A protein has these predicted regions:
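Conserved Rossmann-like nucleotide-cofactor binding loop
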Residues: 73
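Nucleotide/phosphate-binding catalytic cleft detector across ATP-hydrolyzing
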Residues: 1-70, 78-178
Length: 178
């Protein structure tokens, strides 16, 4: 038996999701980077299409399907029908901006400096657009006045206030799609 000297894992064919708003230059840079890293073949697919396929939405039918994909750096909004994208928009505001909004809110309202990982934990634990419960979350950070460690309790109301500017921008993007 002959043993293959080349493994298909050594030079894979890869599919990369890209934001709908990415420029041809950005797309080319992504492809070139993947090829330089050893990919045999590179194909790009827009993030909302990949999300719709993954969610099992009927994008090939004559009905409209809307996908809102909130990633780290971008929020992708797309309407698809009959196998194609009817409308798409990529907002440069998403999960990372939410983390930043929590960090800024804690600094402004509580004089508390928190790190990126703490801001992300707040988002995951108590982040909400509409306060429905009286949930609170203990946040540890550094007091900006004294420089000492400090812990404060924040509520869902704090979350609503912190996220409001980010969510307002996303809502406006969704309204544009409608």
């Amino acid at each position: 038996k002959k043993v293959h000297k080349r493994s298909s894992f050594a030079n894979p064919r890869i599919l990369i999701c890209v934001p709908t708003g990415s420029t041809p230059v950005e797309r080319k840079a992504i492809q070139d980077s993947a090829l330089a890293a050893g990919a045999r073949r590179v194909q790009l697919i827009e993030e909302p299409i990949a999300a719709a396929i993954g969610a099992g939405l009927p994008i090939s039918e004559a009905t409209g399907s809307m996908v809102i994909d909130i990633g780290g750096g971008t929020t992708e909004i797309a309407v698809m029908s009959l196998g194609g994208v009817v409308y798409s928009n990529s907002l440069r505001v998403a999960g990372d901006a939410m983390d930043g909004a929590f960090a800024n809110y804690m600094r402004k309202e509580y004089n508390l400096m928190i790190g990126d990982s703490t801001a992300e934990k707040i988002k995951k634990e108590i982040g909400t657009a509409i306060a429905t419960n009286n949930n609170t979350y203990a946040v540890k950070g550094r007091d900006l006045r004294s420089g000492t460690p400090k812990e404060v309790g924040i509520t869902e109301e704090d979350s609503v206030e912190a996220l409001n500017p980010i969510l307002r921008e996303m809502i406006n993007g969704i309204k544009d799609a409608l």
